[in-house]
Curated annotation (Swiss-Prot):
Swiss-Prot/TrEMBL cofactor(s): heme
The keyword DNA-binding appears for this protein: no
Family per record: Belongs to the cytochrome P450 family.
Reaction(s) this enzyme catalyzes, per UniProt: cyclooctat-9-en-7-ol + AH2 + O2 = cyclooctat-9-ene-5,7-diol + A + H2O
Gene: cotB3
Organism: Streptomyces melanosporofaciens
Record protein name field: Cyclooctat-9-en-7-ol 5-monooxygenase
């Protein structure tokens, strides 16, 4: 059912005058509402909701929530953090991430962001890419023609090493990196389950899964804490992210980060710098293998620009089609597939009065697969992002990294790493999907591709 209401723009934005449509998601069942649909088939459920309005009511048990399905409504939510607060659901993520940038709120978030932002300025990102290129070349140096590998697992292993090198540069051995990766997967999966669980009591029970989660969380933070303490003792500046964080000062107060604050930020960057980028790369290589005509254009562009040498940071702006492939992969398979806010006060959204304490959902999955925003949305079409066609995309329709003051601080670094790794691998190898392989995206803390066996073919 769709209803029409007057446009009531948030004070922080000026949307065009148009009648918003509101509706209710079908299929609600007594007591549970739409909870089971969101649990069992979340991607399909979310992608179906824009057909019911710009703002769609969803029942989560006895509570009402709303999914913002129009880019302008999502912008109003993300650009007005004082009204649309991160909410209690982020408190569960603090078990892993502490009071880091990704979960902090209000003035604390603004304070942290101003301190950390210099670590992601362009000269710093350019410096980090040397480690990315070195680790990628080392990883593919052991590949053999005809070898079958799980590209998802392979990219996660590579990106954990890249993240460790970007953060620490030296002083962390391969065994510790592997242990940290193992712990990170357990804790990341556990955070998602705890965030989505309807009852908070489950995480307090002494189950094998909870004990495994607690051990992994403690060990991961211990590994990072030891690295921080050692770097403080040495006082050395290795030009890596850890050195930048240890020397960070607020531009107005001159205050730096203590070891606990650095620990929280480093763990956050490990999660964001390995899990999300690794999944994106796995999706990219699967899509290239499944679309030979696109792969051929990527190879032709890389060969023309690189002329047989390894790619560098300076080459990336010239790899326009390759970057279009990455953007289209992020559209089809956004790492942050759903997020939420909670209204801190009564407000209006999409022509509806929304009480304080109401959960507001927004979903890149719903936006990116909306045929009104992206014609033929299930089609893999990198040319959407080239030339005049890219200008036709509605503002805010693409949302892989969020928006506003809470937009992912490392988005440029993530895109840079992804493009550099794709160009490095594609300059030397083709990856062919094993016949019969079916891509089944797994919505967890981030959208993961699941196992993707592929066969290596030298170019």
């Amino acid at each position: 059912m769709r209803e029409r209401g007057p446009v009531t723009p948030a004070k922080s934005s000026a949307p065009p005058e148009r009648p918003w449509t509101t509706g209710t998601a079908p299929g609600s069942v007594p007591l549970l509402g739409h909870t089971m649909a969101l649990w069992r088939r979340p991607l399909q459920f979310l992608a179906s909701l824009p057909a019911h309005g710009d703002l769609v009511e969803v029942r989560l048990g006895p509570s009402r929530a709303y999914l913002a399905c129009h880019p302008e409504l999502v912008r109003q939510v993300l650009l007005n953090p004082r009204v649309f607060d991160k909410g209690g659901v982020f408190d569960k993520a603090r078990q892993l991430l502490g009071n880091s940038l990704s979960v902090s709120r209000g003035e604390d978030h603004r304070y942290q962001r101003r301190m950390i932002q210099p670590a992601f300025h362009t000269p710093k990102i350019a410096a980090y890419t040397a480690a990315v290129a070195d680790d990628t070349r080392a990883a593919i140096g052991s590949w053999e023609p005809g070898r079958t590998l799980d590209i998802s697992d392979t990219m996660h292993a590579l990106l954990m090493r890249v993240a460790a090198r970007t953060l620490f540069s030296t002083g962390i051995d391969e065994a510790t990196i592997d242990e940290a990766r193992h712990c990170l997967r357990i804790v990341s999966d556990g955070i998602y389950k705890r965030t989505m669980a309807p009852l908070g009591i489950m995480e307090k029970l002494p189950t094998p899964g909870n004990r495994r989660y607690d051990r992994a969380n403690a060990r991961l933070r211990q590994i990072v804490d030891e690295m921080i303490r050692e770097r403080r003792r040495s006082g050395a500046d290795h030009g890596d992210l850890l050195s930048t964080l240890l020397r960070a000062e607020h531009p107005e107060t001159g205050k730096g980060l203590d070891d606990g604050e650095v620990l929280d930020q480093v763990v956050t960057f490990l999660v964001a710098g390995s899990e999300t980028t690794a999944s994106t790369l796995a999706f990219v290589f699967h899509l290239l293998g499944a679309h030979p005509e696109v792969e051929k254009r990527v190879h032709a562009e890389i060969d023309e620009i690189l002329e047989g040498r390894s790619p560098t940071f300076e080459d990336l702006p010239s790899l326009e089609y390759t970057r279009g492939v990455i953007t289209e992969s992020l559209r089809l398979y956004p790492p942050s597939w759903m997020a939420m806010r909670v209204t801190a006060a009564e407000t209006e959204l999409g022509g509806r009065t929304v009480p304080a304490g109401t959960m507001i959902l927004y979903s890149a999955q719903a936006l990116h697969h909306n045929p009104e925003l992206f014609p033929d949305p299930e089609r893999f079409d990198p040319e959407r992002w080239l030339g005049d066609r890219a200008k036709e995309v509605e503002r805010g329709a693409l949302l892989p990294f969020g928006a506003g003051s809470h937009k992912c601080i490392g988005d440029v670094l993530a895109l840079t790493e992804t493009a550099l790794i794709v160009a490095t691998i594609a300059s030397r190898w083709r990856l062919r999907p094993v016949p019969g392989t079916t891509l089944r995206p797994e919505p967890k803390a981030t959208l993961e591709p699941g196992p993707l066996p592929m066969v290596c073919e030298p170019r």
